[in-house]
Regions:
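Residue-level micro-sites within transmembrane alpha helices that shape
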Residues: 10-13, 115, 243
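Bacterial N-terminal signal peptides that target proteins for export
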Residues: 5-17
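Bacterial N-terminal signal peptides
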Residues: 16-25
Length: 340
């Protein structure tokens, strides 16, 4: 048995050793100013990331779709592939009843690229068959009327079958209808919960970002865009800014034609850090980023499986590092079904 003094010295040595190892581990860990797991939500207004992905299919990330939920009402921004399945997942996994498919009645499109709108028919018809009894109200840029009319025409047989008063598969007569509203900048929507203001963004077609002012929060979402003063002005100290980004490391590896397109129509991590420094949001959420939690290339027998289509994905830690080295504010790299 060790003398008491020696035993005490050994205990002290173990404590000092453990503390030193802990400090080394903390120093080696990536510096993250943001919460990687959203805290329990206590405000009336919640931001729900239904889809944070890109045009490239990724089993972890649905197409772009974000819900602003105020009390028991939900407002959808964009409706990429998988939107209604993700909405139901938010009901089951996050207990947000406002996102029941039949409850989705108001939506906003930032622009009409297919990766942001491929879930439009799903929003219309799944919401209808799930119980929506009033026309869907959808706001967006020029071309929304035409897209809506063509979708309804494409599903005419389904509509006629489900609304036939003598048929066996009857649904309510109004839930399939859509009131589409083509917008310009300014206040475009208001109700008892929210005022929605559209502002122009810079992308390959007519595009808008949106600011939501609710009783307790202000939320701005960019959609696809290169950095703009309009986005900075729309936020101007907002509670939450949701903005797209691409890692500089990945961007530099793209072919020249894609770099040229990206420079005009998207935002790099460095640019986003500079924009957020000026806009001063309480929380910056990075979404629609060309990243993947899956390896870029995996072996499948003798054939490689590539997640991208003629391009590259970065990893979340690269984007985290690039933004964190230039931005001192609170930020997160968003994942599907995160709630803030």
């Amino acid at each position: 048995m060790l003398p008491q003094a020696l035993e005490d010295a050994v205990k002290v040595a173990w404590v000092l050793c453990y503390s030193a190892l802990l400090l080394v581990a903390l120093a080696a860990a990536p510096q993250q100013r943001a919460l990687q797991t959203p805290k329990e939500h206590t405000t009336r207004t919640r931001v729900v990331l239904l889809g944070t992905g890109t045009p490239v299919p990724d089993p972890e990330r649905s197409g772009p779709a974000t819900a602003i939920v105020v009390d028991n009402s939900a407002y959808l921004v964009d409706f990429g592939p998988g939107v209604m399945r993700r909405a139901k997942a938010a009901v089951l996994d996050r207990h947000i009843a406002a996102l029941e498919p039949g409850n989705l009645k108001v939506a906003f499109a930032t622009h009409l690229h297919s990766d942001h709108t491929a879930g439009y028919s799903d929003l219309i018809f799944t919401g209808w068959t799930a119980g929506r009894r009033t026309p869907l109200e959808v706001y967006g840029p020029t071309g929304l009327h035409s897209m809506t009319e063509h979708l309804l025409q494409a599903y005419r047989i389904d509509i006629e079958t489900r609304t036939n008063p003598e048929g066996d598969q009857r649904s309510n007569p109004d839930g399939w209808k859509v009131n589409s509203h083509e917008i310009k900048s300014g206040v475009i929507y208001r109700d008892a919960n929210v005022i929605v203001t559209a502002f122009p963004t810079k992308h390959a077609m007519e595009s808008y970002g949106y600011r939501f002012d609710t009783p307790d929060r202000s939320v701005v979402i960019s959609g696809d865009t290169s950095p703009t003063e309009e986005t900075i002005n729309a936020c101007h100290g907002c509670d939450v800014l949701i903005h797209e980004a691409r890692a500089v490391e990945m961007f530099a590896k793209l072919p020249e034609d894609r770099r040229s397109f990206g420079a005009k129509n998207h935002t790099t991590s460095e640019q986003l850090a500079a924009l957020a420094t000026k806009a001063k949001p309480g929380l910056l959420i990075v979404y629609h980023a060309w990243i993947s939690w899956w390896p870029s290339v995996e072996a499948a027998g003798d054939q490689p499986v590539v997640l991208t289509s003629g391009g590259l994905h970065s990893t979340p830690d690269v984007l985290q590092r690039e933004i964190g080295s230039r931005y001192s504010g609170n930020f997160v790299i968003g994942r599907d079904l995160d709630v803030y």
